[in-house]
């Protein structure tokens, strides 16, 4: 199944959503996945907004782990979608509520 549905990748974006800046990875993933999600929503009457929100948070987790290995990127307004508790990984224990696996509420990072 082709997830792109004829959508071309942006100039300078990372191959297969890898590499590039975090904003480019988010953009690449959305370009590839949104047509697929929209089609599935029409076919099944399933609300895909939760999947989209989860996808954003998983990209944030990927970005966080990438930074732990290679060092931080330039900070930007698009670096954080959602927010993090003190231990950022706690959030991903229960990504669809305001509480992470550590039981602490996470709030969006201050600019």
Swiss-Prot record:
From the UniProt entry, list the residue stretches annotated as the region Disordered. Answer: 1-26
Superkingdom is Eukaryota
The name this protein goes by in its record: Uncharacterized protein W02B3.3
């Amino acid at each position: 199944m082709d997830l792109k549905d004829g959508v071309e990748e942006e100039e300078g974006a990372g191959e297969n959503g890898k590499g590039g800046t975090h904003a480019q990875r988010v953009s690449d993933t959305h370009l590839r996945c949104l047509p697929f999600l929209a089609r599935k929503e029409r076919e099944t009457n399933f609300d895909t907004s939760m999947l989209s929100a989860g996808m954003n948070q998983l990209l944030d987790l990927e970005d966080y782990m990438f930074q732990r290995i290679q060092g931080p990127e330039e900070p930007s307004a698009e670096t954080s979608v959602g927010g993090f508790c003190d231990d950022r990984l706690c959030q991903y224990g229960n990504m669809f509520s305001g509480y992470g696996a550590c039981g602490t509420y996470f709030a969006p990072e201050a600019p």
